Amino acid sequence: MKMNFFNSFPQYGVYILGLNLLLCGVSEGFIGFGMDGFEEMFPLLMLGGMNGGQSNYVRPKPIAPTLPPTPPPPMVKPPSITWRWVPNTRYTWPLFNNMQWPQYNPYVLPLANNAMAKTGSAFNTNTISGTKASSGNAMPVLPAPNAQMISSGGPVPPAAGLMNGMGMGLAGSNMAAANQMTWNTQTTSKGSTPM
């Protein structure tokens, strides 16, 4: 906005022109102020408009109130469906540590089976094996604590019981001819395996 004299009383100029006549009257011959002809303007220069007097301040355009910027909408992360392949150990012990679930050493029990079935001729019923009198070759059943295999989680079952007629060993039942023939293919001609 361009500055001019009437910025001092933009709204009430006519009212103040009447007011200064009321204050000063008409004094034409009076020269005491040294303002010849401007006596009526003196209240205008002093009082100015009803808005606060003559000033060189130009009112700026009003600033429209603005809201703060709207925050972004909340990001909803989709659930991760990645399977982490971590074993659950919250409700159970790990298998190799749980004394209720014996994890037999995968090396020990076949070794006991082989030693009893191949070396111990007392349990070897193959036809070409030695006499049963040569049972001194039989591997003894280990007493505790040697039978307690540390990494197995439990005691090793007695090796002698594995090769009895129950047929629980690797050789199967020693009463079945087919199992004896299959087992015999892994032995020497004497029926014993060199250790």
Swiss-Prot record:
Q: Does the keyword Secreted apply?
A: yes
Signal peptide coordinates: 1-29
Q: What is its main location?
A: secreted
Keyword annotations of the record: Secreted, Signal
- Recorded superkingdom: Eukaryota
Query: Which is one Gene Ontology cellular component term of this protein?
Result: extracellular region
UniProt subcellular location: Secreted
Query: What protein name does the entry list?
Result: Proline-rich protein 3
Q: Which organism is it from?
A: Lottia gigantea
